[in-house]
A protein has these predicted regions:
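Charged, low-complexity intrinsically disordered terminal segments
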Residues: 1-280
């Protein structure tokens, strides 16, 4: 990182750096993937900066990811979330008011809200977004996630939706990037299947997108996985949009190249590893 900063002139900071006088939680990591350009355009999603994200590493087959760009004052939450992480653990805080978008909301703009989920806020915004959407779903819930290790609250919400007749579909990778975590994902998938949730696999390889579509009306895109770490340990960013056009596009994209999951879970291994799910 130091070499990159010196070569490019980009200011870089290590988040929650572990050192001799390290005080932060070792599991509290910045998992957000976001960018704000000139305070006008924001980007969120699952895309990191790495070879696999640009199709140059095919060990997991095709690596599918997702993201969303948008403009307007809603990007301010991304800017605020960035500086929350940028200043984490520091006494002196950066002043970021000059980076904020001052434009008036568009009169014909759809409903769009940026959310930041952080362990420092006491409540998991990510978990609340999932539970609120799923508990209020009337017809369908379609989710893509690379890791399926939700807490009991989200698991119960998914099962309850399926029980009341909502078509609940979750797409997981066909080829894993981490075999140990995948064993837990398969174990959870088996349990959710028994409770009426339709679990599918991305046929072409590894799906890293964290997208959701509900009732063909609401869409969510961001960095948060459907797992314990993203919900309670990591800093995450995402965007909620009320738009039938966008929601249907997201739903089609999630289900594209997805096939029914028929594989058996990793037996005792998966069940035992689930005990360590919060640390995975």
């Amino acid at each position: 990182i130091k070499a990159f900063a010196a070569e490019t002139g980009v200011t870089c900071r290590c988040f929650n750096k572990i050192g001799l006088f390290f005080k932060g939680g070792v599991n509290n990591r910045n998992h957000s993937k976001s960018a704000v350009i000139d305070g006008v355009k924001g980007y969120v999603g699952g895309v990191n900066v790495g070879d696999e994200y640009f199709g140059e590493d095919l060990r997991c087959g095709i690596w599918k990811d997702g993201g969303m760009s948008y403009e307007g004052r809603a990007v301010n939450a991304l800017t605020e979330g960035f500086f929350t992480a940028y200043d984490f653990g520091r006494r002196k805080k950066e002043r970021y008011e000059r980076y904020l978008n001052r434009a008036k909301p568009a009169a014909d703009g759809g409903e769009l809200r940026t959310f930041v989920s952080a362990p420092t806020r006491g409540v998991s915004r990510l978990a609340e977004v999932y539970k609120t959407l799923v508990y209020n779903a009337k017809k369908s819930v379609v989710i893509s996630t690379p890791y399926l290790i939700p807490d009991d609250g989200v698991s119960s919400a998914l099962a309850a939706a399926a029980a009341r007749g909502v078509e609940v579909s979750v797409v997981i990778p066909g080829i894993p990037d981490k075999k140990t975590v995948y064993a837990v994902t398969l174990s959870v998938a088996e349990k959710l299947k028994k409770r009426g949730v339709n679990v599918l696999k991305y046929k072409k390889g590894f799906i890293h997108a964290k997208n959701t579509a509900v009732d063909g009306r609401y869409a969510v895109c961001g960095s948060g996985n459907l797992d314990y770490r993203s919900m309670y340990l990591h800093f995450e960013t995402g965007v909620f949009v009320k738009s039938a056009k966008l929601a249907k596009t997201v739903e089609r994209d999630i289900l594209k190249d997805a096939a029914p999951y028929e594989e058996k879970a990793a037996g005792v291994k998966g069940k035992l590893l689930k005990v360590f799910a919060p640390m995975m």
